[in-house]
């Protein structure tokens, strides 16, 4: 399995301001996930890491502000464990169906646009 990043399209830049299209073709749901300060999603339960896994949707996570570290686990991949330090310039991280995933932010937090 090869990880994919969907590129963003910067259509205008002025001093201190960037305008870009954050859309991902073929998606039908969008949510904004804000981490205020150091946060983990989903949070640990009784000291044990928790993970999301979707059986019927592909997530596309685009950092809007800050940075987010994603842990991806998928036993079907040749390399089943990946840690991605995601920033906006990388584009939207595609998380395939059946992939266990979680994310953390540093002390300053982050904002991510998730399109599925």
Where do the protein language model's features map onto the residues?
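Histidine-centered metal-chelating micro-motifs
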Residues: 90-103
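Active-site region of the double-stranded beta-helix
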Residues: 1-88, 107-116
């Amino acid at each position: 399995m090869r990880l994919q990043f969907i590129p963003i399209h910067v259509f205008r830049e002025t001093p201190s301001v960037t305008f870009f299209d954050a859309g991902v073709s073929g998606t039908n749901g969008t949510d904004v996930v804000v981490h205020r300060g150091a946060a983990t999603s989903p949070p640990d339960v009784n000291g044990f890491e928790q993970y999301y896994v979707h059986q019927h949707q592909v997530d596309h996570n685009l950092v809007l502000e800050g940075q987010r570290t994603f842990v991806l686990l998928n036993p079907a991949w040749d390399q089943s464990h990946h840690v991605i330090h995601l920033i906006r310039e990388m584009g939207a991280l595609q998380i395939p169906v059946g992939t266990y995933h979680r994310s953390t932010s540093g002390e300053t937090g982050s904002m991510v646009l998730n399109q599925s």
